């Protein structure tokens, strides 16, 4: 299993880092078999798996439950788990206790926090306490309630400079990596060159040290539409829907189960049942 020191070496050597989300045992198993470098148990599970319209309703228990399943499916892959909405915006002590609970109970190797500002101090304190932290800048889904959209971030000079400053701040605080989401590729390149820690892009161009995409987006499973930055590698929904419809039709038409799908008992044993009704 790769560790933070390996990710630092990959950045230094120019080897791209691959991260994929996973939310349960089978998806995690698939991701590990694909030899991805990292798994992100994102609070995006709220929208992708639980059917919420944002990540805000996701709880600590949700993250722990799903991370435990992921760990069983991918025991040899570095796992990062999101700290959900408002679990790191209270006191430092509350943040540390919440991170401790996630790491101890789920087995996650690191936690991910969105934003900068007051979050920078939380990253520093978590790092001091021995909890590896991945930062997340640019489009931060937990803040969409305030920003009102999932549009590209940091397109103006002022916003771009602020993001660079924030990236340097979370690096100084001890973050082991930074996810850069939905920012101009030129800015992502500048940030990547300015930092010694790896950058993982999602909608941030080719120049980041690595890439992350949502499992369901990659394979086309249960999604309504793909974002611009997502490349379609499969569309398994096109296979799933007819398969399920065929099953329903076979049952209705007495075409399933066939004899080969059934169990039998010896004829002499069957005869022994006669007259016992």
Curated annotation (Swiss-Prot):
One of its GO terms (biological process) is pantothenate biosynthetic process. 3-methyl-2-oxobutanoate binds at residues 43-44, 82, 112. Coiled coil: none annotated. It comes from the Bacteria. One of its GO terms (molecular function) is magnesium ion binding. Pathway: Cofactor biosynthesis; (R)-pantothenate biosynthesis; (R)-pantoate from 3-methyl-2-oxobutanoate: step 1/2. Mg(2+) binds at residues 43, 82, 114. InterPro entries: Pantoate_hydroxy_MeTrfase, Pyrv/PenolPyrv_kinase-like_dom, Pyrv_kinase-like_dom_sf. Binds 1 Mg(2+) ion per subunit. Its EC number is 2.1.2.11. Its cofactor is Mg(2+). Keywords: Cytoplasm, Magnesium, Metal-binding, Pantothenate biosynthesis, Transferase. PANTHER family: 3-METHYL-2-OXOBUTANOATE HYDROXYMETHYLTRANSFERASE (PTHR20881:SF0). Belongs to the PanB family. Homodecamer; pentamer of dimers. This is 3-methyl-2-oxobutanoate hydroxymethyltransferase. The gene is panB.
